[in-house]
Regions:
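Bacterial N-terminal signal peptides
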Residues: 17-25
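N-terminal secretory signal peptides
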Residues: 32-89
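A low-complexity, Ser/Thr/Gly/Pro-enriched, surface-exposed linker/loop concept
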Residues: 85-104
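Low-complexity intrinsically disordered segments
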Residues: 98-170
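Sec/Tat signal peptide C-region and signal peptidase I cleavage site
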Residues: 27-31
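Bacterial N-terminal signal peptides that target proteins for export
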Residues: 4-17
Length: 170
């Protein structure tokens, strides 16, 4: 086997789990890849995605997470699983127009992405803090087995943002 053939085969193997996940996943991702780079010699990578809030225009969250490479998958198994570690940062990226959002303490999910074939995903939830007039975004791991406390937080204070509330301010 030539080096070019081996590299092509390795690329195909690396993309296979993602292709299968996309085929089996009923949820449609609204995130856009804005960055992707390798962080070690085994081909493991870091993925940066832009996630717009579907009910709050003018807000974009950037979510970063790990993507396992072929060598890592071969040596450790778990072909169809990525770690659920993530980090989030949300910013005002335009005039803020807030639609009908959940204002209870549970907030509402604005994004979810599978990190394995079954039961594991990264989710982003928005909570409105009425007291401080702040949008709170929490990125967290949803894992059935061995639930973990992997999460990160980002906030957008609405104090100087002069948002428009299309359904009226709560």
């Amino acid at each position: 086997m030539t080096l070019a053939t081996a590299k092509g085969f390795a690329t195909m193997l690396r993309q296979l789990p993602l292709t299968l996940l996309l085929c089996l996943s009923a949820a449609v991702s609204r995130a856009e890849d804005v960055g992707r780079f390798s962080n070690d010699w085994t081909g493991n990578g870091i993925v940066v995605e832009a996630v717009p809030d579907p009910k709050v225009s003018g807000v974009t969250c950037h979510l970063v997470h790990f993507d396992r490479g072929v060598i890592d998958r071969l040596t450790k198994g778990n072909w169809f699983e990525n770690p659920s570690n993530s980090s989030i940062s949300c910013q005002q990226t335009g005039p803020i127009v807030i639609g009908k959002i959940a204002t209870g303490t549970k907030g509402e999910e604005v994004f979810s992405e599978r990190m394995s074939l079954f039961f594991k995903s990264i989710a982003v939830r928005r909570i409105y803090d009425k007291t401080t007039d702040t949008l709170v975004y929490v990125a967290y791991s949803r894992q059935v087995k061995d639930a973990s406390a992997k999460m990160s937080l980002s906030t957008i204070a609405l104090f100087n943002a002069n948002p428009t509330w299309s359904a009226g301010k709560p």
